[in-house]
Amino acid sequence: MRMSCNGCRVLRKGCSENCSIRPCLQWIKSAESQANATVFLAKFYGRAGLMNLLNTGPDHLRPAIFRSLLYEACGRIVNPIYGSVGLLWSGNWHLCQAAVEAVMRGSPVTPIACDAAVTGQAPPFNNKLCDIRHVSSRDENVKRRSRGACKEERNVRSLSHESSLSHESPVSSEETTTEEPKTWIGLELTLGLEPLARGNHVVVPMKKRKLERCGTSEDEDTCKIELGLVCSE
């Protein structure tokens, strides 16, 4: 049965043949120091964050990644402003090395005073030559060009719309001023057995249509409907 490595044991996780932590601890001689370093990094970066950072590199680079994370975390605790890079630049790398040794022993790390961290010699990150914030990215240039093109297109559309409205306005006024000639046509529609004489131009309204019933003894059940439609100018 394969035993778990010291890193997986303190993290209380299963250790397999493809363990990411086991090769990272080979440069540390003591088992207690391996456990202390793993617990310290798990508290600083988080358990999931530590595993993700270790798994980003290939297998032969994972020990170097583990050591780099350890020195960076210790340097950040000693100098919260500039970290391990600031300690290296200011000539105080021995403070970072002492912090790493304290972590191996399980002792607390003592940070430097805030005044000393602020007034100390800072790395040249504030130099304009090293600052890349003034360099505009290609995506920003594309966005600016697209915004300018959209504004020009909107202006052209608004101008064309206004010109079309100005051309349409006199036509609409002419159409409103024209009046159709008022002509009245009277139609007379007749429906019956007997034709209506052309000389009679009487228009029978709809409400006054006559329903006449013949009173002869021969056709008692017959009805006569007269509907008149006369055309008159």
From Swiss-Prot:
Where the record annotates domain LOB, the positions are: 3-109
Question: Which Pfam family is an annotated match for this chain, by its short name?
Answer: LOB
Query: InterPro entries recorded for this chain?
Result: LOB, LOBD
Q: Where is the composition biased (Basic and acidic residues)?
A: 143-160
Q: Which organs or tissues contain this protein? A: Expressed in roots and flowers.
- Residue spans with biased composition (Low complexity)? 161-175
Which portions of the sequence form the region Disordered?
143-183
Q: Name one GO biological process term.
A: response to gibberellin
Q: Which family does it belong to?
A: Belongs to the LOB domain-containing protein family.
What protein am I looking at? LOB domain-containing protein 40
